Amino acid sequence: MLQKSDTNVVAEVLRGQGEFYEFDHYPEGDVYDQETHSQYYYHSHREGEHGHFHTFLREKGMPKDCRPVPQSEADFMKTRDDKLSHLIAISMNRAGYPIHLFTTNRWITADNWYAADDVIRMLDRFEMDLAWPSWPVNIWVTSMLRLFRPQIVELVRKRDAAVANWRKKHPDVDAFEDRGCDITSDRKISVEAQIKRVDQALTTVAT
C-alpha cells in the first residue's frame, strides 16, 4: 500500500509533524491505543540510522500478575499514574526500511523494568488498532512484533543478561540508568529473509 503511494512508514509517521529534531517524539504525544494500552513513538539519537520506533505496553494492558523487578527509583516514575514496559525498538534506515532490533536500559525509554519472562508475555498483547496517525504504520508496527517475535524474545533475554553483567562489573553505578549500558542487545534484521524463513517453516510443517 505504501509503496504504491510512493511513501514509507517513516515518511508516514513524520507527515505533518514539522521539523525533525533529535530526541523529540513523533508524532507529538506518542501513539497510544486506549483499548490495548499499546504505545509507540519514533525518534532519533543514534548514528547509522535515520531513527527508530520504541514500543511499549502500559500497565492496564499487561497480564495482571506482572510486577516490576526491584530497581532504582527515578523522578519519571513519580510523574506517571501507571507503569509501562519497553518491549523492543525498531531501527530504520533513510529509505524507510527496518534494519535492526534492539533493547535498552531505562536511560532513553524512562520505563519500569520488568523481567524478561514478563516482557515476553506482553508481546502478544501489543496491538495498535487505530487510524491515527497512519493506519498502515500502526498495522506495520504491530506486524513487526509478530513477524520477529522469536528474535525479540532472544533480545529481551539478552537484555536481562547484559544488565546483570553490567551490575557485576560496575557495582557503583545504576545499570538501569547508566548511559554506558544504554543498548543492552541488538541484531540486524531483514523482512525479506524473515518471510522466507517463515515460508520454509510452513512448507516443512505442511509436508
Place the predicted regions along the sequence by residue:
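Long, compositionally biased interface segments
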Residues: 133-207
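Aromatic- and glycine-enriched beta-alpha-beta binding-site module
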Residues: 25-99
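Short linear sequence elements within intrinsically disordered, low-complexity coil regions
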Residues: 45, 58-61, 119, 131, ...
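Domain-level detector of nuclease and nuclease-like folds
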Residues: 81, 99-129
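N-terminal domain-onset segments
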Residues: 1-32
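Amphipathic alpha-helical interaction segments
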Residues: 58-66, 110, 115, 121-122, ...
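Generic preference for hydrophobic/aromatic residues in regular secondary structure cores
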Residues: 38-42, 98-102, 145, 190-193, ...
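Alpha-helix initiation/capping motif
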Residues: 56-59, 93, 115-116, 129-133
